């Protein structure tokens, strides 16, 4: 019995360990978010199918790692779901052919927020999976340890909803101009959702965000966000109503706003956070 990864890294007869680099493309699902489907990444075969039947399980102790180490979820093994990190060994899958067959493992996260996410950098460890191989012929009992690494920078959604982008940069035109902010949200199932803004503000009404430009900043001006013409103060929840699988726009527009005193020419920049909440 031996295994290999999609890029050709092999663990030979007798077991061992290998690193698996996967391109993460997480998907928000109802009740669980797909992190990675490893059936497209790890393949195994039986070297002596005429005389031996190999049995393969996912062993107790498999878990998320790195920035995901504090999260839990489920693992789908051969079509059935089990808690992850694994607290017991899964039922076995039979390997009885020399032809490489996918190892049927997919990892999911349990949502813990509305539309949160965890940023993962390329090269980061995300999980350690322990494949156990036995057979019906002798006392062979080998471990194949797979260290799963991200091959790309990605944000893994940790909520039941997700946004079109985690970072949105818009460029305001000249003073008194405005620009729409292209930000949408969708959910795996319909649920009432709202959001609020956060950031450093320059006025008593908490509605004008401070100009934080470090190079040649303009004076007397900040940035204000509106929705359908209505000013949105920081920390005031805006209701979006029921949000389902079709993306819903937040309807935000960025505008200049006077903070007092004389307006002088220069650069204007503000960083404004958007936090989603279930309602």
Predicted regions and their residues:
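Mature extracellular/passenger domains of Gram-negative fimbrial/pilin and adhesin proteins
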Residues: 1-279
């Amino acid at each position: 019995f031996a295994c290999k990864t999609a890029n050709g890294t092999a663990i030979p007869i007798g077991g061992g360990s290998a690193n698996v680099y996967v391109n993460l493309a997480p998907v928000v699902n109802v009740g669980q978010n797909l992190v990675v489907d490893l059936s497209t990444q790890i393949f195994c075969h039986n070297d002596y199918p005429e005389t031996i039947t190999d049995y393969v399980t996912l062993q107790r102790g498999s878990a998320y790692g790195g920035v995901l180490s504090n999260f839990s979820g489920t693992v789908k093994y051969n079509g059935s779901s089990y808690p992850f990190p694994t607290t017991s060994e899964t039922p076995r899958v039979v390997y009885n052919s020399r032809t490489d067959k996918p190892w049927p493992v997919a990892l999911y996260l349990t949502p813990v927020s509305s539309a949160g996410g965890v940023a993962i950098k390329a090269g980061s460890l995300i999980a350690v999976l322990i494949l156990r191989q036995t057979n019906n012929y002798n006392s062979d009992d080998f471990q194949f340890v797979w260290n799963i690494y991200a091959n790309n920078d990605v944000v893994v959604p940790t909520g039941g909803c997700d946004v079109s982008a985690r970072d949105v940069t818009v460029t305001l035109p000249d003073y008194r101009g405005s620009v729409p902010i292209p930000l949408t949200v969708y959910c795996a199932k319909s649920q009432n959702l709202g959001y609020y803004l956060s950031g450093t503000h320059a006025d008593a009404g908490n509605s004008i965000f401070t100009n934080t430009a470090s190079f040649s900043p303009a004076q007397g001006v900040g940035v204000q966000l509106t929705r359908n013409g209505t000013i949105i103060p920081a920390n005031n929840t805006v209701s979006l109503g029921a949000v389902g699988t079709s993306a819903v726009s937040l309807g935000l527009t960025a505008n200049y706003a006077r903070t007092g005193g004389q307006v002088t020419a220069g650069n204007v920049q503000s960083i404004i956070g958007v936090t989603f909440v279930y309602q």
